[in-house]
Regions:
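N-terminal cap/lid segment of alpha/beta-hydrolase-fold proteins
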Residues: 13-47
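Short, surface-exposed "cap/lid" segments of acyl-processing enzymes
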Residues: 45-102
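Glycine-rich "HGGG/HGxG" loop immediately N-terminal to the catalytic nucleophile
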Residues: 91-120
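Alpha/beta-hydrolase active-site loop
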Residues: 110-141
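Alpha/beta-hydrolase-fold enzymes
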Residues: 142, 146, 156-325
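Short beta-strand/loop motif that positions the catalytic acidic residue
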Residues: 341, 347-349, 353
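Short alpha-helix in the alpha/beta-hydrolase fold that links the catalytic acid
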Residues: 343, 357-366
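Catalytic histidine-centered segment of alpha/beta-hydrolase-like enzymes
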Residues: 381-394
Length: 427
């Protein structure tokens, strides 16, 4: 980093500026109609002596499945956008990060009211779409006193944005990163997994039921034997056979991705990361290790991964099996709203990404009616590193350009100069 005072403002780059000098950080809450308290983290830009072309423009960031706010903060995504002056608001969906299950219990106790009905991992993608995203949009608009805001979603967050933008007029521009509009298209392995999901879920339920039955029978037998031994005076042996800890039956309520990743992290050293990079050409379904640093990846593994409810996974599988993105509670098919999207839009994906590829994002690109419409791959990228890898700077430039375009054309449609007649073109 060059010393700030030795570089003219016009020549400054984001690398010349300290991250913490770009913002004031606060947190605030949004209340959903079904009783959840969601936390948003705001990075409010501060004026600096260099160009900030989108200063103060509110931008809502929404993470993907099994993630939290650190999907955006584990690399330099937020810093790059702050350098341009964006007013960043990061939503954490219910059960993720600071919008945790524990927070709901605390808020319910403080208000002397029951916690949300779906608190014990009973929500699905419809909950994110019908409750969380509308509450967050309303909160950002209220705090910034804006009628419209900008939106950026990664993976599932981008899919929610597709559906929302087709129904509502709250976005002045929308950016999606690694967000498929036809999930599973061109990815037969994912389709096979989705087809198997109902059977796999049922098998897990049966296995857990059998384990619970064995445990219950064993505990009852131990209790009965302990009582019998106590009656004949064998108290020491009776105490050894008495079931110790309280027990509750095990159920399949969520996918414990956080626990899996912690297990992986124990064997994840810089040396093993470099070894993994040499094999990455064959293992780029979720990430391409060559496009991110080992420290950023490990930090994200430790802080940015969350468990996801079973119902969310089941809804993803249903989307893939049916070839649709839909809100099943209302019957709304997201694709029906694609032609109603006319605001500036950027659809960005990794050229190695199997989850959101050119094939699986083509539907939204072809259906949207935006005059400013960007659809492009990021070379060498897969899925996760799009928000924290080596190439985020070019993505942030795309976001800046979209916001700048929308701001400059508020209240008027963009138009190119028109040539009056052929003669004027030759003069």
């Amino acid at each position: 980093m060059r010393h700030f005072g030795t570089v003219s403002p016009a020549a400054l780059t984001v690398d010349d500026v300290e991250f913490k000098s770009l913002y004031r950080k606060t947190e605030y809450e949004a209340q959903t109609a079904d009783g959840w308290t969601l936390v948003l983290t705001r990075y409010q830009p501060v004026p600096r002596p260099f160009a900030q072309p989108i200063f103060g423009e509110p931008l809502l960031l929404v993470h993907g499945a099994c993630q939290n706010r650190h999907a955006w903060t584990s690399g330099q995504f937020v810093k790059n956008l702050l350098f341009f002056g964006a007013d960043i608001h990061i939503l954490e969906l219910r059960g993720h990060g600071k919008s945790s299950v524990d927070l709901q219990r605390r808020r319910a106790a403080e208000a002397d009211r029951p916690p949300p009905a779906d608190l014990e991992w009973g929500w699905d993608i419809d909950s994110y779409f019908l409750q969380d995203l509308p509450a967050a949009v309303a909160a950002v608009k209220s705090l910034t006193k804006r009628d419209k805001i900008f939106f950026c979603g990664h993976s599932m967050g981008g899919m929610l944005g597709y559906g929302y933008a087709g129904l509502h007029d709250d976005f002045e521009g929308i950016v999606t990163i690694g967000a498929s509009s036809e999930l599973g298209k061109g990815f037969p392995i994912l389709k096979a997994i989705a087809l198997a999901e109902p059977g796999l879920a049922a098998a897990i339920d049966v296995a857990l039921a059998a384990a619970n039955l064995r445990e219950a029978v064993g505990r009852r037998a131990g209790k009965a034997t302990s009582m019998a031994l106590a009656r004949i005076g064998a108290k020491e042996l009776a105490g050894a056979l008495e079931p110790r800890a309280a027990w509750s039956p095990r159920t399949f309520r969520y996918l414990p991705v956080d626990e899996w990743i912690r297990w992986v992290d124990t064997a994840f050293t810089k040396k093993s990361y470099e070894r993994f990079r040499t094999l990455s050409a064959f293992l780029t379904i979720l990430a391409n290790p060559s496009r991110a640093t080992s420290s950023d990846v490990r930090w994200l593994m430790r802080h940015g991964v969350e468990r996801e409810p079973r119902r969310v996974i089941a809804q993803f599988a249903r989307w893939i099996r049916n070839g649709e993105l839909a809100c099943y509670r209302t019957g709304y098919d997201f694709a029906e709203g694609f032609p109603r999207i006319s605001v500036p839009m950027a659809i960005i994906f990794g050229d190695l990404d199997k989850l959101a590829s050119m094939e699986s994002t083509a539907g939204i690109y072809r259906a949207a009616r935006s005059e400013y419409l960007l659809w492009r791959p990021v070379k060498g990228n897969s899925h996760l590193e799009l928000t924290m890898g080596h190439d985020i700077r070019q993505i942030c430039y795309d976001i800046k350009n979209l916001v700048d375009f929308a701001v400059k054309h508020r209240g008027r449609r963009p138009s190119l100069p028109r040539i009056e007649d052929e003669g004027s073109a030759r003069r």
